[in-house]
Regions:
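Well-ordered secondary-structure scaffolds
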Residues: 1-170
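Conserved small/polar residues in nucleotide/adenosyl-binding loops
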Residues: 172-174
Length: 174
């Protein structure tokens, strides 16, 4: 039986079933399917075509509206097709199918261990970088972050606090 709380939420007991299991490294798949609707709003529009070679971090789809998000490849390889696939909801959704080959990364991705602590860019440029990166919230709806950072002109924010920590504590800890 699931325990529920008066303030809401469901706390399944099963979240600890793997606590005593070894951590294993997952194999890189031979094929990857990347959905174009990973966020609330309009599904992203592909910017690649069948036969294109992509690397980890290559932008493969751009926002298709104000409430939409860019999508980047999480694998390197060759685009096999752009088609629909039935997702976990049972509905057919647009997706990019990639035949995985190797582990090549976009050269423009900074993979260094250094951390940028201060940013001197104007607000508009920061929002553009966030939109280009396809950053979305992880609270369930995957709401595109740049939308939240574009308030009406009458509203002025003095600062933005970004909590870059997974909200589901059960998924974030081993």
């Amino acid at each position: 039986m699931l325990k529920t709380f008066s303030i809401g939420g469901v706390h399944p007991h099963e979240n600890k079933l793997s606590a005593h299991q070894p951590i294993i490294t997952a194999e890189v798949p031979a094929k990857a399917v990347i959905l174009l609707g990973q966020h609330i709003g309009a599904p992203a529009k592909p910017v690649v075509a069948k036969g294109d070679v992509v690397k980890v971090g290559t932008k493969i789809a751009e926002p298709a509206g104000f409430v939409s998000a860019a999508i980047h490849s999480s694998v390197s390889g060759k685009v096999a097709k752009i088609d629909t696939i039935v997702d976990a909801s049972g509905y057919a959704k647009p997706a990019i199918f990639i035949d995985v080959e190797g582990d090549e990364w976009e050269e423009t991705i900074d993979r260094s261990a250094t951390l940028v602590k201060e940013c001197e860019l104007p607000a508009e440029e920061i929002v553009k970088k966030i939109a280009d990166a396809g950053i979305v919230g992880l609270g369930g709806a995957c709401f595109p972050t740049q939308v939240k950072l574009c308030p009406p002109p009458s509203f002025k924010a003095e600062c933005v606090i970004i909590n870059a920590v997974e909200c589901e504590i059960g998924r974030a800890h081993v």
